[in-house]
Amino acid sequence: MNKRMILLMVVSTLGVGTILSSCNKVEPEDEKEVEVEWVDLGLPSGVLWANINIGATVPEDYGQVFGWGETETKVEYSWANYAHGKDFYGLTKYCSDTNYGLDGFTDNDVNLREEDDAAVANWKNGSRIPTKEDCQELKNNCDDQWTTRNGVTGRLFTAKNGNSIFLPAGGYRWGTELDCTRRNGAYWTRSLNANEPGGAWYFGFTEERSYIYFAHRSYGRYVRPVKYTK
């Protein structure tokens, strides 16, 4: 299997795994090496997909959840503490419609900047959150099936070249509650829904199907990074 690998350091803090780059200093008894494999699925764009989520140590781990455009995890996910707006119609960043911006704000940015990309901030290895188009390409060019791996439910995406990635069904977080675990997968793209910019596109799935839809940006969802080769 054609894979490109990096090593990351994971530090356990209050039970939550935090991803740091290998150059960060950590206490030896707390450090743990995590091998991230960049999987070549033979996609037309040449995009490589990571084999684990941000915050995970193995493919079956759910990892960490993030609000759209936020680079740190939180206890609660809501508009009350969202970084880029006060509510669905009170946006302060990433807004393409004056009806959704606070006091008519717009900036017409429809993709996350690197400064607001959780993959860039947490892994620092050239990875990015995938775009809506990256997820559609994955869906179009792989056979995806609902399966269970090591007791964890999710969807397995298998390419024509035989390589595959597993996305666990970790649900999503709204408020302080983690909902739909083991039944739904919900992964952010870095693409804004330009028609309703209070929402952003995510790659979701159930046992029956995978799909791309949009949700409130303040929701907590998982991130599966990609790396571009072209």
Residue spans of the language-model regions?
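Hydrophobic helical h-region of N-terminal Sec-dependent signal peptides
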Residues: 10-15
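Bacterial N-terminal signal peptides that target proteins for export
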Residues: 1-9
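C-terminal motif of bacterial Sec signal peptides marking the signal peptidase cleavage site
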Residues: 19-22
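Intrinsically disordered, low-complexity regions
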Residues: 2, 16-17, 223
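C-terminal, surface-exposed recognition/capping segments
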Residues: 26-98, 102-230
